[in-house]
């Protein structure tokens, strides 16, 4: 879309993405973050052509937000249906983060980027 008609983004004042990392190890190789690793050419196009500022929420940020087993239990107590849903969709990630990173919990990657887009006050950063 950016290559075909960048004017589509003229009504947007910021673009938020979850991808990459700054001073952190990768999640699909020792150095690569999965989204950028899958399609580095697309990532380059976004950074080269995006006509508005990009808010990049990388692994170095998302690794600070962990859904712990105790927090998941609390969510299930407060809202059983929502808790069961969250448990179902995060099971893989709980297992992955324990096996590969020895993190007890589920690192919240994409939802943090969405939350930061909806409420920019929850994230801070620097311009590069």
Q: Can you annotate each of these PLM segments?
A:
Residues 1-128:
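N-terminal acidic, glycine/proline-rich low-complexity segments
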